[in-house]
Curated annotation (Swiss-Prot):
InterPro entries: SDH, SDH_sf, SDHAF2. The keyword Cell division does not apply. Plays an essential role in the assembly of succinate dehydrogenase (SDH), an enzyme complex (also referred to as respiratory complex II) that is a component of both the tricarboxylic acid (TCA) cycle and the mitochondrial electron transport chain, and which couples the oxidation of succinate to fumarate with the reduction of ubiquinone (coenzyme Q) to ubiquinol. Required for flavinylation (covalent attachment of FAD) of the flavoprotein subunit of the SDH catalytic dimer. Its main location: mitochondrion. GO terms for biological process: mitochondrial electron transport, succinate to ubiquinone; mitochondrial respiratory chain complex II assembly; protein-FAD linkage; tricarboxylic acid cycle. This is Succinate dehydrogenase assembly factor 2-A, mitochondrial. Pfam families: Sdh5. It is found in: Mitochondrion matrix. It comes from the Eukaryota.
Amino acid sequence: MLRQLRLTMDILGWIFLPWRRSISNIKDSPPPPPLASTFDDVIVDYEDPDYLPLPEYPVRPNEPLETRKQRLLYQSRKRGMLENDLLLSTFAAKHLQNFSAEQTAQYDQLINGVSNDWDIYYWATDVKPTPKEYDTEIMRLLKKHVKNAEGVTRLRQPDLNT
């Protein structure tokens, strides 16, 4: 048994020998430069170039209001980024069923007229100013929802009503 223990210690010595050498080299070397912390709060957001072809969102003038609300509920849940999935799905679950036809059209324009979901997120959280064409009653309601004055926990999307 003592022989096995000694053999194990010899093997471990060979395994950790390069590691020990690197530790001794680290002690003799100067410390690494500090990480640059000046860019922690900078949002890198470039303007879209003019030549970038963006498809036009199809206008659906004859879509019934209930069908439109169902489509918007689905689209609010499936944004492709978790932040907007949570914000818009909880917002739609809370407010969409009470929207008038005009408010529903404003919400449709907001979530489908913008080409970049990060813009919606930054506007709703007041990180960036909202452009005039999207600064509507619905956007103000969304900003109020995002501030979460009620203190509601929003860790997942709300259940769908069946």
